[in-house]
Amino acid sequence: MIIEHALLRVGEDRGDAFAAAVRAAFPLIESAPGCHGAEVRVQHEDPSIYLLIVQWDSVQAHQAFRASALYERWRAATHHFYAAPPEVTHFLAPLAR
């Protein structure tokens, strides 16, 4: 399993509307094949920055979502709030303890 980590910079004074749009659009991500859950958190220091965290089977599962109609609907619901393009990276399994 991998973790998608996306920093989302939202335009000034658009946080409440963005949060409502994300809540409504979550089923689009969570119904995607290979998705094991998603959450969005707001940054404490700068409330215009949000962190999207999604658990995927693989990077390929995330890429398949990005090529799907579900993603187009997610994008239509959320991307117009962004002040800058999202910064998306993927993280591997946790290090052994």
Predicted regions and their residues:
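An amphipathic, aromatic/His-enriched active-site/gating alpha helix that lines ligand/cofactor pockets
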Residues: 24-36, 55-89
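Short, surface-exposed ligand-recognition loops at beta-strand->loop->(often short) alpha-helix junctions
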Residues: 9-21
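Generic structural motif
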Residues: 11-13, 59, 93
